[in-house]
Amino acid sequence: AVSQNIAYADVDGNIGLQTCAGIPIRIKGDGLMVVPGWTGEYEWEGIVPFEERPYSLNPSTGTVSSANNKTTDEAYPYHISYWYALHYRIDRIREMLNSKEKLTPRDFMRMHTDYQSAMAQDFLPGLLQVIHAHREELSPAEASALNLLRTWTGTMEAHEAAPAVFDHFYVTFVRNLFHDEMGDSLFTEYTRSSYLSRYAVDKIWKNHGGIWVDDIDTKGTEESLEDIIWVTFQDVVADLGKKLGKDPESWEWGKLHTLTLSHPMGSVKILDRVFHLNRGPYPAPGSFHTVCPYAYSLANPYHVNHGASQRHIYNLADWDKSYVILPTGTSGNPASPFYLDQTEMYLKGDYRQDFFSVDKVKETAKYVLILQNSR
């Protein structure tokens, strides 16, 4: 089964986070690469006992949180994985959790739809420094794009232009770093696994360079990180000008970054036309690096393929004051009024009440579905 971090809370005020996974105890290696299977030197010695798997119970911080991030430090004796999300989303989550002594359901609603990018705030100083060093060379469009970034707060709103410049810079930067060494086929496969390329980019940025920086297609020249940043920025302005028009102020992120809700049978065009199975594209805020994750593959940029499949806020003091919203609806039947009827609410950050008591469930039910054995 897929490994999970399970968050826990109960009516007595206890909270916890438990890693639920079969973590192998390896004689040798970390499971990342292909190894000889016939020598016995890479065998497993068993599974880490449940009591020794990472957990947190009633921590002194008063909160537990998880965003696909690494939950152990270097002292943890067992190797779990390299397959973690970068720290930016969990950093922002913890910043918001610590911002108030007491949090309300409305605060958690705002957290669910938070588009502030800690990654953008981390990358911007270095990016702006390089562009500023070339300020005498800037075209009018480049100067306008620079101004968008310079005055930006780092919030990935769909109606703003700066997010389009920033994320397109990131996507183009990944290509300019790796494509010359990898070529088309390997680069496509590499960027399908977004965690790998994101970790590599983060390390290169923080170390101010690395073996991938030099463009091997420019013979006799060894590029620095600053060279690649400058070339990438020029590429971005030229490319967005072709995609979204000549005026950088009109480069709204939601024109580039979209969400389409696709039915499993919606790929059959005649069925989609007749039954209106697919919906969208909708302009999408956020990104893979925001707490509200409208994420996309670097191999197919800006087409949202990952996000919150449900948003829940549970009130353990009064279960009937809990909240929920889905990106689609409670029915998979296109003829149902409950097919994709929550999408607009989901995109706006709105919620429905989520009832648990028998009386409230019966009172608010639209209909009752009874499944009977025919025998």
PLM feature spans:
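C-terminal/peripheral segments of proteins
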Residues: 1-134, 138, 147, 151-375
